[in-house]
Amino acid sequence: MNLPNRLTVMRAVAVPFFVALMLIPVNGVACEGWCKWTALAVFIIAALTDLLDGKIARRYQLITNFGKFMDPLADKLLVCSALICLVELERIPAWVVIVIIAREFVISGIRLVAADDGVVIAASKWGKFKTVFQMIMVGFMIGNLPVFDILTQILMWIALALTLISMVDYIVKNINVFKKL
């Protein structure tokens, strides 16, 4: 397994540890004190592996079908688990998370149908923008510092817009997948 794929797997493996840190109560409150900052550190490190795996894979021609498939899946695991934890902590509206996760199911469905035909659909430019904004938004929501409340809300709306734009982009670019159904 090459280095970019190892980084992708490392990101996926970090998810259960991250979720545990998000939900461990400290003095009766989840995601506070050392747990909050450790969860944020784990999330940032995991998010940085997303940046690194792609850069390394492109620079050294280490792009694989495994990476094309698993990289977006590891992103989904990390971001969706974080969003679900944030709903539990009442830091993000549930409807926003439902829209984001619904988009992930739609795109995953398109990828699975395409994979059945031997086609691997890599992440799009809009999908990458969406992931970056979602990860930044999640980081601010984990930190939960009142001074960033307005910025966090702006990031949420941008991430939501990019979620919908990227979904439409994937559907339009892969309309041929639907024609085979």
Regions found by a protein language model. Give the residues of each.
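Alpha-helical transmembrane bundles and membrane-interface segments of multipass inner-membrane proteins
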Residues: 1-181
